[in-house]
Amino acid sequence: LDALIAIGGDGSLSILHELARRGNWNLVAIPKTIDNDVACTHWSIGFDTAVNTIVDALTRLTFTAASHDRVMVVEVMGRTAGHLALHAGIAGGADCILIPEIPYSIEAVCRQINDLHDRWGRRFAIVVVAEG
């Protein structure tokens, strides 16, 4: 065995880290996680696909929310990292994005949604929430 290549997220890369700590291995780590939460990387494999899939869903939900005067809350994956919710929410035109890195209160979220109605006459909203 000349080298070990690990393609994965936190779990796979933590195993690789442990191998590096224990011995003299030639190791290559390739981040692959939709969470996009691997340190020292800008993008990970899978993140862009996940963002675009969520944006497609948000586009469809926006039409449904508008036609039925609803507030739609969409929970996206990401564990304790809000990268996926933030990027997809911005690209998908969400009215409110809630991520674990920024504390929020339900009261503030309700005020923001009510402001859409009071200021712009909007009778619907899209809220994206990271699962963490």
What do the PLM-derived regions correspond to, one by one?
Residues 32-42, 67-69:
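Gly-rich Lys/Arg/Thr-decorated short loops/hinges at beta-loop-alpha junctions or inter-strand turns
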Residues 6-8, 16-18, 23, 47-132:
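Accessory alpha-helical/coil subdomains and C-terminal extensions
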